[in-house]
């Protein structure tokens, strides 16, 4: 008999076989319940924005300045200055951002959690965050980790003589990892062409991914799959940086600006490096990559395996990067760790050693650095920056600010004394309110006008939904404020039914103009407000038809953006490829429609009950694209009833697929065989998936009609106001 002690508790945090193990294709609703109050240690009334406003930012920056040159024996500073390390830390915090779904980025301080804290590309950034702990500890809840990581990058640049564009706080911390799709590979840094490759065809990178390998922020610095070809690497750079919303000029500025500072680390073989933080021993207290090579730190540090210092002044802003890039010819060599890198042919030893003042080295570059010279488009920009140092400095300052603030959303979220005054197009600017707002009496009068305009409940509801549901909680973009639904590109999106939308907007514009023309004292209603108000009127009318009197909350204050304030290309990524709330799929996808619905719900910050009640309500209100009848399980469309759930759960109906792709179904009467309803996967999932069925049963019960209306109104109002950061 074994003498090994047996744990009496089988249900420990280490876990047993999970539902995901048994049913790997089961629809995952967990992403809808991340970051709840249950994981947040702060008091219920804690307001981070108010806490940050009380922060002495100048004092924090003084402490950070002092930290830069206070080298610690347990992780010594290169060149006696931590600036390069902290620039990399901030860059990698923000650099996970991707435009396709707005996920990633610096908001929330996700670099603290798995998997990001253990990505190979984030090696030894655990040390950077530990260096910051005394400062975070000192200022506590008044500055989040998310804000501190970016602020530290800014201060690092400033301490090395660079003038930054500005800094905004306002990133509240999260307390658990995001549930983000980073790829399907099972091995860190797995090369393309494998069974789980993120590439297909002619090196087409899977959407929404924005890095070339699992565990990298952008590209492989040695070149594609480690092939040291600067021209081929340029293709990867252009693709990945574009997926982070950067154009060629911003890309060149970021690479050259960032690589003006610090160095890479590859003193010895990767086999001497221990496991990443999440796999390291408990005694290491959350640190990873413990190295057995010599001292394992300082001169002996191993991070990327590359051993490159770009400039002769790695702790000062300079023009050396471009000077070296264009002044030398480059020959391929290998780092002490065996990684591909380049050294200046026949050059003098002008590069200082990071730890030995008596030593000098020849200039070195990464394969991806040389892309800025050997790619024709990048070369033109690089040479212009080389010849115009002030232009380069301005471009880097602006690109750095964009990199570190892109996922913060509108300027209304920016906090602190260093917020730049200049309004930037990528911030999706909206005019400030410049007139008296409508009051409750005006709201009632406008609702009456809208309901008398000839527009149907379905038209009012679908237009308001189309306007507001572009919002993404990931990067805080989109939403009803700005009324960009009337502008390119949104007005032309297939999901918005352009011809029908134009007719609705024309009618609402008539109501708006008549109201505004009749006012004295400058009072106005914006079209952005009126679209949402009209949707509220439609919901109230539909609830009344169901026998429930309800008032949909409404807060005026939205403004109308102009076409000139709208970056058409940047706005295009908000176009839904699927909107299960409107039973819409742009085309066939490998991902099941129900999974796309849950993804959309997560971007709208909805939980399971909110998702459920909104789908059921929007179906009976007739919000489907193209007036499709799939999922309209009611004989009284336009009435806010719980009929969707009642009829979906009716065991008198038998469902069968009627399409080859199993994405359209007929529901027939079990007794007569007569077709009663048609539905999609997005409809039937509420009867098939055990958790969603449990929610559907709540709303399909005999006593649920009033609760259903009340819950629908609450969820509807939430979506309508997701972008109202001015109300917070």
Curated annotation (Swiss-Prot):
InterPro entries: Catalase_peroxidase, Haem_peroxidase, Haem_peroxidase_sf, Peroxidases_AS, Peroxidases_heam-ligand_BS. CDD domains: catalase_peroxidase_1 (cd00649), catalase_peroxidase_2 (cd08200). It comes from Burkholderia ambifaria (strain ATCC BAA-244 / DSM 16087 / CCUG 44356 / LMG 19182 / AMMD) (Burkholderia cepacia (strain AMMD)). One of its GO terms (cellular component) is cytosol. This is Catalase-peroxidase 1. The keyword Zinc does not apply. There is a cross-link at residues 218-244 (Tryptophyl-tyrosyl-methioninium (Tyr-Met) (with W-91)). GO terms for biological process: cellular response to hydrogen peroxide; hydrogen peroxide catabolic process. Bifunctional enzyme with both catalase and broad-spectrum peroxidase activity. There is a cross-link at residues 91-218 (Tryptophyl-tyrosyl-methioninium (Trp-Tyr) (with M-244)). The active site is at residue 92. It catalyses: H2O2 + AH2 = A + 2 H2O; 2 H2O2 = O2 + 2 H2O. Formation of the three residue Trp-Tyr-Met cross-link is important for the catalase, but not the peroxidase activity of the enzyme. Belongs to the peroxidase family. Peroxidase/catalase subfamily. Its cofactor is heme b. Gene3D superfamilies: 1.10.520.10, Peroxidase, domain 2. NCBIfam families: cat_per_HPI, PRK15061.1. It comes from the Bacteria. The lineage of its organism: Bacteria, Pseudomonadati, Pseudomonadota, Betaproteobacteria, Burkholderiales. The record marks 88 as: Transition state stabilizer. Keywords: Heme, Hydrogen peroxide, Iron, Metal-binding, Oxidoreductase, Peroxidase.
């Amino acid at each position: 008999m074994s003498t090994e002690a047996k744990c009496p508790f089988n249900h420990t945090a280490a876990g047993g076989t999970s539902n995901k193990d048994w049913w790997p294709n089961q629809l995952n609703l967990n992403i809808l319940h991340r970051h709840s109050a249950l994981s947040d240690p702060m008091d219920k009334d804690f307001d981070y924005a108010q806490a940050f406003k009380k922060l002495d930012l100048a004092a924090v920056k003084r402490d950070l300045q002092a930290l830069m040159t206070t080298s610690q024996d347990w992780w010594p500073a290169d060149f006696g200055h931590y600036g390069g390390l902290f620039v990399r830390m901030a860059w990698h915090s923000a650099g996970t951002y991707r435009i396709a779904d707005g996920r990633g980025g610096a908001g929330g301080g996700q670099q603290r959690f798995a998997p990001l804290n253990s990505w190979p590309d984030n090696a030894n950034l655990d040390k950077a965050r530990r260096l910051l702990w005394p400062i975070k500890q000192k200022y506590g809840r008044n500055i989040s980790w998310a804000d501190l990581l970016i602020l530290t990058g800014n201060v690092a640049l400033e301490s090395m003589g660079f003038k930054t564009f500005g800094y905004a706080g306002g990133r509240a911390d999260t307390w658990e990892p995001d549930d983000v799709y980073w790829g399907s590979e099972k091995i860190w840094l797995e090369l393309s062409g494998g069974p789980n490759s993120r590439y297909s065809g002619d090196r087409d990178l899977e959407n929404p991914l924005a890095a070339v390998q699992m565990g990298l922020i952008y590209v492989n610095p040695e070149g594609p799959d480690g092939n040291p070809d600067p021209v081929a690497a340029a293709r990867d750079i252009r693709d990945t940086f574009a997926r982070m919303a950067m154009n060629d000029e911003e890309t060149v500025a970021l690479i050259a600006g960032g690589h003006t500072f610090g160095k890479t680390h590859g003193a010895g073989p990767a086999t001497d490096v221990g496991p990443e933080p999440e796999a390291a021993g408990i005694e290491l207290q959350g640190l990873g990559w413990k190295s057995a090579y010599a001292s394992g730190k300082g001169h002996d540090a191993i991070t990327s395996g590359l051993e490159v210092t770009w400039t002769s002044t790695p702790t000062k802003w300079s023009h050396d990067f471009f000077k070296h890039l264009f002044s030398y010819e480059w020959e391929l060599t290998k780092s002490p760790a065996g990684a591909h890198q380049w050294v200046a042919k026949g050059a003098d030893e002008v590069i200082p050693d990071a730890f030995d003042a008596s030593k000098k080295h020849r200039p070195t570059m990464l394969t991806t650095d040389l892309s800025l010279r050997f790619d024709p488009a990048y070369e033109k920009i690089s040479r212009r920056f080389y010849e115009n140092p002030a232009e380069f400095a301005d471009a880097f300052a602006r690109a750095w600010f964009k990199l570190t603030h892109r996922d913060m959303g509108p300027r209304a979220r920016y906090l602190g004394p260093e917020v730049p005054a200049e309004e930037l197009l990528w911030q999706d600017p909206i005019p400030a309110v410049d007139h008296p707002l409508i009051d409750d009496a005006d709201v009632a009068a406008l609702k009456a006008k809208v309901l008398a305009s000839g527009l149907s409940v379905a038209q009012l509801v679908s237009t308001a939904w189309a306007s507001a549901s572009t919002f993404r909680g990931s990067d805080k973009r989109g939403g009803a404020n700005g009324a960009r639904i009337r502008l390119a590109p949104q007005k032309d999106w297939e999901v918005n039914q352009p011809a029908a939308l134009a007719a609705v907007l024309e009618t609402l514009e008539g109501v708006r103009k008549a109201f505004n023309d009749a006012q004295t004292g400058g009072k106005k209603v914006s079209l952005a407000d009126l679209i949402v108000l009209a949707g509220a009127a439609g919901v109230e009318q539909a609830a009344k038809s169901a026998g429930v009197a309800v008032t949909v909350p409404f807060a005026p204050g939205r403004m109308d953006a102009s076409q000139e304030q709208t970056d058409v290309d940047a706005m295009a990524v908000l176009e839904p490829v699927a909107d299960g709330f409107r039973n819409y799929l742009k085309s066939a996808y490998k991902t099941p429609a129900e999974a796309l619905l849950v993804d959309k719900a997560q971007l709208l910050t909805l939980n399971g009950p909110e998702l459920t009640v909104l789908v059921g309500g929007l179906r009976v209100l007739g919000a489907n694209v193209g007036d499709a009848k799939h999922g309209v399980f009611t004989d009284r469309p336009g009435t806010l009833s719980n009929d969707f759930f009642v009829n979906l759960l009716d065991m008198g109906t038998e469902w069968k697929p009627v399409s080859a792709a199993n994405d359209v179904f007929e529901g027939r009467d079990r007794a007569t065989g007569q077709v009663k309803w048609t539905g999609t996967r997005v409809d039937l999932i509420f009867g098939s998936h055990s958790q969603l069925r449990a929610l559907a049963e709540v709303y399909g019960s005999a006593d649920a009609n009033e609760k259903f209306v009340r819950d629908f109104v609450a969820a509807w109002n939430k979506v309508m106001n997701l972008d109202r950061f001015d109300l917070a």
